[in-house]
Structures are given as structure tokens and as C-alpha cells.
């Protein structure tokens, strides 16, 4: 079996009490099934920790220390966090009525040092969320303005689609890569744009979902297989213990569904996870420009582990790179940086995209 020639979905249940699973992620087929089994079997028994506040914090710290893939890249002094957080956990009275809240808040605080939207602590009463990866970035989206452009849109396969600028430009808004679509859906969408000069593909506020859907959509914009990046997984407990890079390809799909005319992809800081991988891949598609803000990142595929008390921590365990070998964890910059003004009266990213397509059309031989 040749590397990178097809994709295998890994959707395994939790393997052990400290097992793991990959969520909504697709990997290229590896050189042999033994490599896949080796990856799945890389989980080993951690130091046995007591089911106490301090024991759970120690277990959480060790899981991140040994399995999280961005400790070195983000220059995090993870070692320095262990003792202070365990000491604070030891001060929690396990018999206190709010002990579970105290422990949760302490763990969430520790995890937020990672600044990673793929890192979550799941409990029966709350889920931790990191927001630092998108806070403080300029706005590229206004929901009220956006609705005006969708007034006459049709909807199928998770995509709103319509035409703009006197029916001369196609427009698609895809709000989540969790929404499935078929080749037939794409056929009807693209057929409705047959007389259009170009296409605006809007993935702002798209927080991700299936990497398979992301690459299937990207395949619409190429007529040949295209290398778009690489991935690596942890293979040891050291912060830099990774497998060799494996290539990621976007493969040509149904040849009926090809769009090779000018295309503008709109992105913002909330374009995260699978959407981040999508815009990274689209940089290698002909006739495509990225417009908007730096995407949100989330260039690590997630894995989950269970703590002694039954809570689950999810974190990034597989690193993804672009075709030049650069990490996409911190986001993908657009070709043209743009944002909404403080008091917008129109969606100027959409209007800017229309201008770019019209300019390209006016300066072409048609």
C-alpha cells in the first residue's frame, strides 16, 4: 500500500479506562496496519494516581505532559505548573459541598495555559472552554448584515447558496463542517452558478467538524491530486517524540463537480479546526484567494483520556502542517487582510470579494 493514496476513517471507541479516541478526524492510510495499531496502542498505563483532588490534578498534568503535541511549539514551561497546581489541589477539602466545582475551576485554569480550543475538560456538570485563541482579534463578521445577503438563498447539505451582483457572482455560506453534503448537492449548487464570473465561498464563523468534508469540498477546486500538508503523531512521552511526517493530499473527486473560475474564500478568527485545515489547503488551489482575518488555528487532531474520577480531558495529539512544513496551529493568514469597520452598513468582506472578482473578469479575455 502506498502512503497517502487513500483515507481511512478512525472512529474507535475508548480502548481502556484511560483509553482514547479520535473525534471527527480522518487520516491518510499508513504504510501498514501495524503502524495504525502502533499508533492506537501507544497509550500506556500512566502512573496510578489516587482519586483525590491532588491525584486527579497530577494525572491531568501527566497526560498533557506526555501526550499533548504543542508543548514545545508554544514554548510552555509545563514542568513549572505541576507543583503549584498540585499544592492548590491539596488544599481542596474533598468532602466540601462545592469540591467538584473547585477542582474543575483549578483544572480549567491549568489547561488554559495551553491556549488551545481543542483542549476541554468534560464533566457531568460543566465543560471547560478556552477562549484566548480568538479574543482580541478584529471583527470580520456581523450576523445581522450577513442575513441580508442570505434573504433569497437556498439551503442544502449545510450550505446556503445564492447569487449576488445581479446574478453575476455565486455565493456559498458553509457554517459548519459537521454538516454533511453529497456530490449531488454540489452538482446542483455549482450548476446554479454556471453563468457566474466567479464564486465567493464564506467559511467565517465555521468552527470546524469533519476533515473529510473539508478536503472533499477543497477537491472541487482542483483537477489533479494536490499535496496540501503533513501530519505527525506522538510516539513517545517526550515533548518532541513524534513520528515521521506523513503527507496529506486533496484527491480529485467527482469530475462533474469542478469549479476552476476565480474564487474568494472568506475567513475569520472563528474559522477553526477542520476549517483552519480547509483554508490552509485552499492556498494551494488555482484561482483561489483568501480574504478576511487570520483563521483561528486548531491545527491538532484531538484525543481524549479519562481521569481517575471519571472526568475526560480532550487535547491536541496530532500536529498538522502546510505543504511547506509549517505548523498551522496558530492560524492561516489570508492573501488579503481585511475586517469590518466599527459601524458597518454592509458586509465589506463580501463587497470586497465582489470587487476582486469583477476586476479579474474585466481584465481577462473571458
Model-predicted segments: where are they?
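Polar/charged alpha-helical tracts
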Residues: 17-23, 80-83, 147-151, 339, ...
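Bacterial Sec-dependent N-terminal signal peptides
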Residues: 1-50, 365-366
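Short linear motifs in intrinsically disordered/low-complexity regions
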Residues: 8, 12-13, 127, 167-168, ...
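Flexible, low-complexity junctional segments that flank or bridge functional domains
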Residues: 41-233, 240-247, 262, 304, ...
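C-terminal "post-core" interaction segments
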Residues: 43-64, 207-366
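Intrinsically disordered, low-complexity segments enriched in small/polar residues
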Residues: 2, 17, 29, 36-39, ...
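Short regulatory "switch" loops immediately downstream of catalytic or recognition motifs
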Residues: 1-7, 88-93, 320
Amino acid at each position: 500500500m502506498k502512503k497517502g493514496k487513500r483515507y481511512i476513517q478512525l472512529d474507535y471507541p475508548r480502548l481502556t479506562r484511560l483509553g482514547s479516541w479520535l473525534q471527527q478526524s480522518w487520516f491518510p492510510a499508513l504504510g501498514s496496519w501495524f503502524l495504525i495499531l502502533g499508533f492506537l496502542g501507544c497509550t500506556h498505563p500512566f502512573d496510578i494516581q489516587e482519586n483525590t483532588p491532588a491525584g486527579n490534578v497530577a494525572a491531568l498534568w501527566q497526560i498533557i505532559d506526555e501526550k499533548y503535541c504543542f508543548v514545545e511549539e508554544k514554548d510552555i514551561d509545563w514542568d513549572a505548573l505541576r507543583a503549584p497546581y498540585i499544592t492548590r489541589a491539596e488544599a481542596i477539602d474533598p468532602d466540601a459541598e462545592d469540591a467538584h466545582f473547585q477542582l474543575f475551576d483549578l483544572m480549567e485554569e491549568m489547561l488554559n495555559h495551553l491556549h488551545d480550543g481543542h483542549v476541554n475538560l468534560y464533566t457531568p456538570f460543566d465543560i471547560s472552554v478556552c477562549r484566548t485563541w480568538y479574543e482580541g482579534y478584529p471583527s470580520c463578521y456581523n450576523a445581522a448584515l450577513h442575513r441580508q445577503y442570505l434573504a433569497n438563498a437556498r439551503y442544502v447539505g449545510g450550505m446556503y447558496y445564492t447569487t449576488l451582483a445581479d446574478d453575476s457572482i455565486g455565493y456559498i455560506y458553509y457554517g459548519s463542517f459537521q454538516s454533511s453534503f453529497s456530490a449531488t448537492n454540489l452538482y446542483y449548487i455549482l450548476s446554479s452558478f454556471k453563468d457566474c464570473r466567479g464564486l465567493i465561498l464564506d467559511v467565517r464563523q465555521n468552527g470546524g467538524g469533519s476533515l473529510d468534508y473539508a478536503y472533499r469540498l477543497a477537491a472541487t477546486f482542483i483537477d489533479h491530486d494536490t499535496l496540501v500538508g503533513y501530519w505527525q503523531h506522538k510516539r513517545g512521552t517526550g515533548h518532541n517524540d513524534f513520528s515521521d511526517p506523513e503527507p496529506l493530499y486533496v484527491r480529485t473527486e467527482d469530475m462533474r463537480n469542478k469549479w476552476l473560475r476565480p474564487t474568494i474564500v472568506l475567513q475569520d478568527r472563528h474559522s477553526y479546526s477542520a476549517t483552519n485545515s480547509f483554508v490552509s489547503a485552499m492556498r494551494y488551489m488555482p484561482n483561489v484567494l483568501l480574504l478576511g482575518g487570520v483563521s483561528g488555528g486548531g491545527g491538532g487532531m484531538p484525543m481524549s483520556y479519562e481521569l481517575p474520577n471519571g472526568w475526560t480531558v480532550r487535547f491536541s495529539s496530532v500536529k498538522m502542517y502546510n505543504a511547506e512544513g509549517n505548523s498551522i496551529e496558530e492560524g492561516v493568514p489570508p492573501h488579503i487582510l481585511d475586517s469590518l469597520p466599527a459601524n458597518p452598513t454592509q458586509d465589506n468582506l463580501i463587497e470586497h470579494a465582489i470587487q476582486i472578482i469583477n476586476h479579474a473578469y474585466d481584465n481577462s479575455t473571458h
